């Protein structure tokens, strides 16, 4: 059931009389990051005819193995299968990573305190008195004051009398004696609604604002109020304004209207400025004419909350009012019909892994009435690609680098233009006639058909390669051939391109409705001692962020959803997060950024991640779904982005479900031993909690249409309930860890806890050794985090949660032991902590499966986001408010099926079984 891998390596067969050295050079250049893909570039006696003739291969001979190559008949893979047994001791990197994680946790808690102390990051704009205004011309109001009744009606808070509970020094709103409609500054008359420059602080560019009030304060001073415009560099984008994404740049004349206002004294006004409102969907020519004679223009609004760039809600920038909480809700029922939704949309999943993000998005979109289909997926890990293809058989899964995928898309567009959009029949007729006239030489053979396409950007011969199926040869003899070698086979190329375009094996601009993905940014990893803080994008390990945005710029999807670790907002002053925002805004996308905690959506783990929405100006900008579950708080948001945490306001008292615990997630799973060779087994018991009943549902009950109307394979079976096998020494150690809450290596013989919670050897106990002769308590456990750690060989408990699901299962420096069994958590137990349905099967060695699960986006988070995406796509929500309160029934979708299945279970739905 493995997917067809366009970039899979296969040793080429030497053809004709000699094999070019070119193929060998390709091998040498591809060993570092991916499987070597050899391409036959053999010299030919003569050009092949249009039928695809090629010099016949010489008789197959045994060849020495080339590093990184796959022998014929072997399973295709990007790296060798390793023994699925835990390492005897943690390596230096593993221990260092653990120490980095501990430091990060401590720093995160400090940031929470700092964020609370700092309050809102919004900057109050206080104007400075203009030098010109301090001359002979004293600023003054013009005309009679606005009538008292009108003034009190338009600006009621200005006339509220301060009370003991609302002292003037605590009230940000200046009080007014009267209001005016115009004023004169430096002999220039200004009226309400005028756009002006306002003198800013030292070394700051002058502020830009729209006058909304003129009033005389109770202190007899003359004031004006401005609703501020922001330049791109004034927003959270800040210094990241010089980016260039596929030709898209920030226009220095473009500004963004905000809802922020400040009061300043009248003589801070410098001059008028002509600013026009431009409809973001206006014809480019009409837009050029409109802004030709203005100083500045705006087509979007900006809000510090969720770093939002959005369409102006109504004409001329008169933004519609929002609710006080900035939250919208929909009490309508969800789409729970077993019939597929009528409206469809296409999805491209970049850096897809095993498909957690796209799976969740599709499940959530289906609940809103939108059938979101994952049509394409790209990932470099071949095992993850196998998992995704198995669970989404209709998806075109490509096992290749994202930058080579982008290069292929551009070449594919050229091929489609040549062979699909143009009339090429007349040009190919002569080739077909010539092919009939040619006779087949004894050293030539025929191309039967082309069955795959990829782009090779690493070898000396860069460009498009086709996978060729040779006439009279089996699949094991298929080879990858550069397009130049098939230049005399236009009929075969046309046939492949036309059929491929019909099936949409690759997307063209306009084909993709949604792009999602989490570009890896390993250059900001805490363990990376050589991180480039000044220019993070010059680090090759961060370049995938650029590639992701380049793909967005090329395909121009309606929607973009990027996921990443919170470190992109912390490292180098949030450089990578700001870069991503800057790219979308420069490409004229609406955008907003939020941080979401997985536990808030029904999982027993914390796991905070960043999610960045992008939407074309013609579409509704999606909201963020508010939490539905309580959660144990761990860490916090970076100061500059503290208003991006997706959460209820402190003044609100939402009705949240009780936080889920480990017992809720997997207390129903059968006992397994340290070594479990079977990846398919029976449950052997009934579910005990609502979560367990839900996670066991079949595809149709979850509205997963990956197999169409079919049920899909393996449903009803327990999959991947296998732990990483502990080595003999660790297994002996784990068997001696007590079965109790909080147990760890400190409970082993010979360990004593001294001052400051630091472990030390108990001088009264002789050191205990294992049957292998190694110590029961390893030295690394005693010295980890300077002897203060509780993590080595730590046992989880039923009433706890985990900080995050990790990609490795070694117990040396993390708490990952099962509550009551002598083993680490299984792949399925980890998958449940990530919200993967039980029917979701994984492929590859056991360690690879842990990696796939740990790297995935938590499915319930993606599901909630998918629902908001569907609401926006279908036009059933507006983009003015950043947050959305999910319907009360959202967390119990599938309840009909759940309750039906629960009929034979003693525990009522929603009741958690105590362990």
Swiss-Prot record:
InterPro entries: BAH_dom (IPR001025), BAH_sf (IPR043151), C5-Methyltransferase (IPR050390), C5_DNA_meth_AS (IPR018117), C5_MeTfrase (IPR001525), Chromo-like_dom_sf (IPR016197), Chromo/chromo_shadow_dom (IPR000953), Chromo_domain (IPR023780). SUPFAM superfamilies: Chromo domain-like, S-adenosyl-L-methionine-dependent methyltransferases. Residues 445-508 form the Chromo domain. GO terms for biological process: methylation; negative regulation of gene expression via chromosomal CpG island methylation. It is found in: Nucleus. Residues 1-171, 315-338 are annotated as: Disordered. It comes from Zea mays. Residues 81-108 have a biased composition (Acidic residues). The lineage of its organism: Eukaryota, Viridiplantae, Streptophyta, Embryophyta, Tracheophyta. This is DNA (cytosine-5)-methyltransferase 2.
